[in-house]
Amino acid sequence: MGFLFTTFSPRSPSSNTNKLCSGGNRNNSGSCISSKVSAFRL
């Protein structure tokens, strides 16, 4: 999973995560946090 996330936005994953978090939905926020943790785990 981590590898996929890195490949999705190798330029600046932080920016992508921010956009996902900016969705406005509480559910989206959870997904955003999960993505960030995955990226850090890698």
Curated annotation (Swiss-Prot):
Residues 1-30 are annotated as: Disordered. It comes from the Eukaryota. This is Uncharacterized protein DDB_G0283639. It comes from Dictyostelium discoideum (Social amoeba).
